[in-house]
Amino acid sequence: MGFTMGLNLLLLVAMVATNILSLYHLSSNIQSKPPAAPPVPDHLLHQLQTIRATINHLTRLHPPAPPSAKKSTVSIPSDLLLYAHLSPIASSCKDNPDLLYQYMNYTPFSLCPSDSSVAESLILRGCHPLPRRRCFSRTPSSIPTSLPKTPFSTLPEKALLWNSYTCKSFSCLSQSNPNMGFDMKVEQSRFLDYKSGLDLPIPQFIQLTKSSKSVIRLALDIGGGTGTFAAQMKLHNVTVVTTTMNLGAPYSETVALRGLVPLHVPLQQRLPVFDGVLDLVRCGHAVNRWIPVTMMEFLLFDIDRVLRGGGYLWLDHFFSKKADLDKVFQPLIWKLNYRKVKWAVENKNDASGVKNGEVYLTALLQKPLSR
């Protein structure tokens, strides 16, 4: 009896000791594990989640929402689902579902809704290309008997749909702001003479290119407004394509009425041009300090991509704070390693410029012939 109790006690002590040793061993292994890998950046996780959610959402394969989440009361437009099976939807579209659903909520094979402002809101938020495909674009009820034969002729107001704009005529636009580019009498003399050291008249630019034995045939005007730069260059047998956004006024339609080519694309989009085919890229007022620095860097290097060797980059009245030009934008521009043909900086003397210490920069830079 005493022997049996002693044996049981010994077994109990051995079992407890074994468990203690096992716990110690496990805890030491946990502590000796290698350090965890660095976390994935939040912005990258967000982009990956956005892309995954877009694919799942548009193909009805998304996992069930957690119990605490409220179910969406907005149904997905059927044409959006159809498009998603054929082409990828830009991931930024998912970040603006209300705008996207409003834009895609139309009746196929009928007239497109009058919602150009919704389309531009999506484009400016990175939702591009837009997915709407199967409706008929609207046209004016009364068509003008003739269209302008020269890019500086009077523009026929009946050739446009004005319902999306506050102003309902070109005269209204010209009176509200003569510098918007809708007064052809004013535009006819633009880019032709000096008003300050920041200006580079087109005749002088053509002479500069001839003296350096450069040929200018094809160009892109980024943020070109109503296309006046393209119109003036057309008189020198240079083909210029103008990128523009409407933003409350019929810029794209006006470019087309003048017999020129408008591209309705935002600044953040990759330029829809093949590599190394352009002789000139001009950046107008739309390219300025309000563009995020990273986007500006992408834009400059995309311009380098489409320019041929020996082609020109023309920054026309780029404005920023003087300190930012010295510390941020000038070093950014010099990354291209282009030859400096013109570099002029002057104070921006309007109220905003004086208040913020802003300056204008006009630069003409030439891409190296080879690299």
Q: Which role does the model predict for each range below?
A:
Residues 2-208, 362-364, 369-371:
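N-terminal accessory regions of S-adenosyl-L-methionine
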Residues 213-225, 314-337:
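Conserved class I S-adenosyl-L-methionine
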Residues 226-238:
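Conserved SAM-binding loop of SAM-dependent methyltransferases across substrates and taxa
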Residues 252-270, 274-275:
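S-adenosyl-L-methionine
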Residues 268, 278-294, 319:
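A short SAM/SAH-binding and catalytic strip from SAM-dependent methyltransferases
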Residues 293-310, 330:
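A short glycine-rich, Lys/Arg-flanked "PGG" loop and its adjoining helix->strand segment in the class I
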Residues 334-371:
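Core SAM-dependent methyltransferase catalytic element
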